[in-house]
């Protein structure tokens, strides 16, 4: 049985969804090994009562995942921690941890149409930061999915589909 490794980051539990996807993939001869991360678990309560997101602890969690070096798919919701963490920030974090990661990345959101506009216009202050964001988006093929409707079928198809081999990836192997 072929084995695929997935990390999924969402502030809402996707456990049931992941179990269904895993069960369906087994029928296709694929064992899905996955880790679900809720970024809200990496927030600290301040004396004022407010929550403060701890990026360093989340990064340590990612590093501790036993199959990180064998990761096939990295999936993240776009809207995670209000004003502090978006899916694009997690992709940047992934590239910090795995600079040569060249496998599948999935960003999903109920408002997927607004994601790229948000990344380039709202998450970037000024032209230089917009260029940085565009380079980040272009570093790897990113799949954009709506979290509604056919999400489970589409993510299953992306997991099953082998990546197109380029001359660079063939030489790297």
Q: Model features per residue range: what roles?
A:
Residues 32-41, 105-108, 136-145:
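A generic structural motif
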Residues 72, 132-135, 139:
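Conserved acidic residues
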Residues 2-38:
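Conserved acidic segment of CheY-like receiver
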Residues 94-124:
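A short, hydrophobic beta-strand element within the central beta-sheet of small alpha/beta folds
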């Amino acid at each position: 049985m072929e084995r695929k490794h997935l990390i999924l980051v969402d502030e809402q539990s996707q456990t049931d969804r992941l179990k269904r996807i895993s069960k369906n993939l087994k029928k296709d001869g694929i064992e899905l090994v996955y880790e679900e991360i809720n970024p809200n678990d990496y927030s600290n309560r301040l004396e004022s009562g407010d929550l403060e997101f701890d990026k360093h602890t989340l990064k340590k969690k990612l590093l501790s995942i036993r199959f990180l070096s064998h990761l096939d798919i990295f999936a993240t919701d776009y809207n995670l921690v209000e004003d502090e963490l978006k899916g694009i920030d997690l992709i940047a974090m992934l590239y910090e941890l795995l600079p040569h990661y060249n496998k599948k990345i999935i960003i999903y959101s109920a408002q997927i149409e607004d994601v790229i506009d948000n990344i380039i216009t709202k998450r970037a202050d000024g032209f230089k930061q917009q260029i940085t964001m565009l380079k980040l988006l272009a570093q790897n093929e990113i799949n954009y999915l709506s979290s509604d409707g056919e999400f489970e079928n589409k993510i299953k198809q992306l997991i099953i589909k082998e990546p197109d081999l380029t001359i660079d990836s063939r030489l790297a192997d």
